[in-house]
């Protein structure tokens, strides 16, 4: 994946997140500032997702912890084999919102 493809892929990820949160009537606010996408929950806690262009990685930070994902086999996967979408669902649940992305 080159840098252009990386940015296009991340934009698709962020769009899917927003679409699913809205479609499932989640009480959250989404915001994008530069390379950072944040989801703010009712209690003001956040899930932060940012793109790391030099590494071509997607990072996720939440109450659950921090994870680094690489795009492999058409999926964002962490070094220990965790799926990005499953980790995001777990993170949202830890912040009080049940949402499904798959």
From Swiss-Prot:
GO cellular component: cytosol
GO MF terms held by the record: ferric iron binding; ferrous iron binding
UniProt xrefs under SMART domains: Frataxin_Cyay
Coiled-coil residue spans: none
InterPro entries on file: CyaY (IPR047584), Frataxin/CyaY (IPR002908), Frataxin/CyaY_sf (IPR036524), Frataxin_CS (IPR020895)
Keyword Iron: yes
GO biological process: iron-sulfur cluster assembly
Annotated keywords: Iron, Metal-binding
UniProt record similarity statement: Belongs to the frataxin family.
Function noted in UniProt: Involved in iron-sulfur (Fe-S) cluster assembly. May act as a regulator of Fe-S biogenesis.
Protein's UniProt name: Iron-sulfur cluster assembly protein CyaY
Lineage: Bacteria, Pseudomonadati, Pseudomonadota, Gammaproteobacteria, Pasteurellales
